[in-house]
């Protein structure tokens, strides 16, 4: 079978070694004669999977002991509601920084539960899209928390600064598309959440890291399935969890640890991004309209000089084993999502194709 590189923004490519192990264990897991999908989530075998996954995740991100790690449902969109429902307490407003599509979507959901103070951080610098630095973000005095999205998958915009707003500001962040791709100082945040389907594992699982002093404040109307305290008190097994996604994510964590951890991923991700952006920047045939300081290393949108060639580019790239390069419907063009599981070899194959395509059609 020819090598296929999947550049989908999510569900995204998984490490080949992880898929191979899952395939080998699919029908007979741990010698039980059954699949991990078929065992009880409350049985000792799966409890061990759950505990190891949490330990490995904590190790990878150096999660402090005063933070709880929850394995939840509902994806990022579920957390758009869960954050205000759990963290507002008796306050009625929260600060929301708008830097792109997903931040704006979180704001729309938050308006159901509070009156958000929205700060538009989007700017244009020399004709390129950018984000105002954190020192210019205007926060209110009475907000329960401040929410932002460090990586916008559709816009291809990243905010790599570490929050430093003082100990009284509870920072909540949507790390769905950048979790585990670079080191982060968890202690600077009150809540970090991430849908699994990009850098963690299969769709269906959502991981929440929450500082323990923020528990116990849920709105009385908060659905139990979104209540952080309930999930924490029940070991993330308030109801039947997505066990297969949890198991596979655990395999990904072990793969990450065996391959140098987050620090090594950070180096490789930088190499991949530099390679791809280098081809784009050194060409008049391709373009990216994000300022270099805010370019995403995970999601690289680009356009062809002649959009009439888009269809041919997608057809030929697919035939070459480079899949899922079509840009989001909101922005069009192309998009290469190059998460942890995408090897440098895959980005090299893409850039080689891009150079050759330009040679023939430029």
From Swiss-Prot:
Cofactor: pyridoxal 5'-phosphate
Keyword Cytoplasm: yes
GO biological process, one term: pyridoxine biosynthetic process
Catalysed reactions, semicolon-separated: O-phospho-L-serine + 2-oxoglutarate = 3-phosphooxypyruvate + L-glutamate; 4-(phosphooxy)-L-threonine + 2-oxoglutarate = (R)-3-hydroxy-2-oxo-4-phosphooxybutanoate + L-glutamate
Assigned EC number: 2.6.1.52
Chain positions found as N6-(pyridoxal phosphate)lysine: 198
GO MF terms, alphabetically ordered: O-phospho-L-serine:2-oxoglutarate aminotransferase activity; pyridoxal phosphate binding
Main EC class the enzyme belongs to: transferase
One cellular-component annotation, GO: cytoplasm
Presence of the UniProt keyword Nucleotide-binding in the record: no
Keywords: Amino-acid biosynthesis, Aminotransferase, Cytoplasm, Pyridoxal phosphate, Pyridoxine biosynthesis, Serine biosynthesis, Transferase
Major site of localization recorded for this protein: cytoplasm
Positions that bind L-glutamate: 9, 42
Cofactor note: Binds 1 pyridoxal phosphate per subunit.
PROSITE patterns linked: AA_TRANSFER_CLASS_5
Pathway given in the UniProt record: Amino-acid biosynthesis; L-serine biosynthesis; L-serine from 3-phospho-D-glycerate: step 2/3; Cofactor biosynthesis; pyridoxine 5'-phosphate biosynthesis; pyridoxine 5'-phosphate from D-erythrose 4-phosphate: step 3/5
Record-linked InterPro entries: Aminotrans_V_dom, Aminotrans_V_PyrdxlP_BS, Pser_aminoTfrase, PyrdxlP-dep_Trfase, PyrdxlP-dep_Trfase_major, PyrdxlP-dep_Trfase_small
Subcellular location: Cytoplasm
Sites where the protein binds pyridoxal 5'-phosphate: 76-77, 102, 153, 174, 197, 239-240
Summary of the function given for this chain in its UniProt record: Catalyzes the reversible conversion of 3-phosphohydroxypyruvate to phosphoserine and of 3-hydroxy-2-oxo-4-phosphonooxybutanoate to phosphohydroxythreonine.
Family membership: Belongs to the class-V pyridoxal-phosphate-dependent aminotransferase family. SerC subfamily.
Assembly notes: Homodimer.
Protein name: Phosphoserine aminotransferase
Organism: Shigella boydii serotype 18 (strain CDC 3083-94 / BS512)
């Amino acid at each position: 079978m020819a090598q296929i590189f999947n550049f989908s923004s999510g569900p995204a490519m998984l490490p080949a070694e992880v898929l191979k192990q899952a395939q080998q264990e699919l029908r007979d897991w741990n010698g039980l004669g059954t699949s991990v999908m078929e065992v009880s989530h409350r049985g000792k075998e799966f409890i061990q999977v759950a505990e190891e996954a949490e330990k490995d995740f904590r190790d990878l991100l150096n999660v402090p002991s005063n933070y709880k790690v929850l394995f939840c449902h509902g994806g990022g969109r579920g957390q758009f509601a869960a954050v205000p429902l759990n963290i507002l307490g008796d306050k009625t407003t929260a600060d929301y920084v708008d830097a792109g599509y997903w931040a704006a979507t979180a704001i729309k959901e938050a308006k159901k539960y509070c009156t958000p103070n929205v700060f538009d951080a989007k700017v244009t610098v020399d004709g390129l899209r950018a984000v105002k630095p954190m020192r210019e973000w205007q926060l209110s005095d009475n907000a329960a928390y401040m929410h932002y999205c460090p990586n916008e998958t559709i816009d291809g915009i990243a905010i790599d600064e570490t929050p430093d707003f003082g100990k009284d500001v509870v920072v909540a962040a949507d790390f769905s598309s950048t979790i585990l791709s670079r080191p982060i100082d968890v202690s600077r945040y009150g809540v970090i959440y991430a849908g699994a389907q990009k850098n963690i594992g299969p769709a269906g699982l959502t991981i929440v890291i929450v500082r323990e002093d923020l528990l116990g404040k849920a709105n009385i109307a908060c659905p139990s399935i979104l209540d952080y305290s309930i999930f924490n008190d029940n070991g993330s097994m308030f109801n039947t969890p997505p066990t297969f996604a949890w198991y596979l994510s655990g395999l990904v964590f072990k793969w990450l640890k065996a391959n140098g951890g987050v620090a090594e991923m950070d180096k490789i991700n930088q190499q991949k991004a530099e390679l791809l952006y280098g081809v784009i920047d050194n060409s008049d045939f391709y373009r990216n309209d994000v300022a270099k300081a805010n370019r995403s290393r995970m999601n690289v949108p680009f356009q062809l000089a002649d959009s009439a060639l888009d269809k041919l580019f997608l057809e030929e790239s697919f035939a070459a084993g480079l899949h899922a390069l079509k840009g989001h419907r909101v922005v069009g063009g192309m998009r290469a999502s190059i998460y942890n599981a995408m090897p440098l070899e895959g980005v090299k194959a893409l850039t080689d194709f891009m150079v050759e395509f330009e040679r023939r059609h430029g």
